[in-house]
Amino acid sequence: MLSHKTQHKSIYTREKSYKCKKCGKTFNWSSILTNNKKIHTEQKPYKCEECGKAFKQHSTLTTHKIICAEEKLYRCEECGKAFCQPSTLTRYKRMHRRKKLYKCEECGKAFTQFSTLTKHKRIHTRGKHYKCEESGKAFIWSSGLTEHRRVHTRQKPYKCEECGKALIQFSTLTRHKRIHTGEKPNKSMWQTF
């Protein structure tokens, strides 16, 4: 069995039998040659989750992560998220601006894509064929009128199994159930109203 000192010496005295065809460098270990080959490719498989910057070698990513963790100099004023590169912050800020760029003039609802706004606008332009005789309020869908009529009839078909409270609309029952479960409403759901 070789002593540790002898094994260590062999690293420096051993013939470097692994040669890179691209740059001509030679290495003692095939794993180091494999690492070296990554330098010559366009592939950057190691990505920083913090700022999105990609690297060819894992060791470079590790070094970057240390710097990134220590020096988050560029902070988004809107949400507080920090980045280690100004270009990454700039890209991120664009996302905030795009978030709700297209707004409906009719109801004020905002969308991230113009095509979604266009589809939404059909709600306002489509004929409201279902009209309530009592209040004159019109609806696009018959289900909307049916649900609205319950306001006048005081019909409450949706009942909570937990406490027995009856409600006019299913959506109101869903919100009511949160009292019993302690569940908080989804923030994005409420942003649409």
From Swiss-Prot:
UniProt keyword Glycosyltransferase, yes or no: no
A GO term from the CC aspect: nucleus
UniProt cross-references to SUPFAM superfamilies, sorted A to Z: beta-beta-alpha zinc fingers
UniProt-listed InterPro entries: Znf_C2H2_sf (IPR036236), Znf_C2H2_type (IPR013087)
Alphabetical list of PROSITE patterns matching this protein: ZINC_FINGER_C2H2_1, ZINC_FINGER_C2H2_2
The keyword Transport is annotated on this UniProt entry: no
Organism expressing this protein natively: Homo sapiens
Name of the protein in its database record: Putative zinc finger protein 726P1
One GO biological process term: regulation of transcription by RNA polymerase II
Keywords: Metal-binding, Repeat, Zinc, Zinc-finger
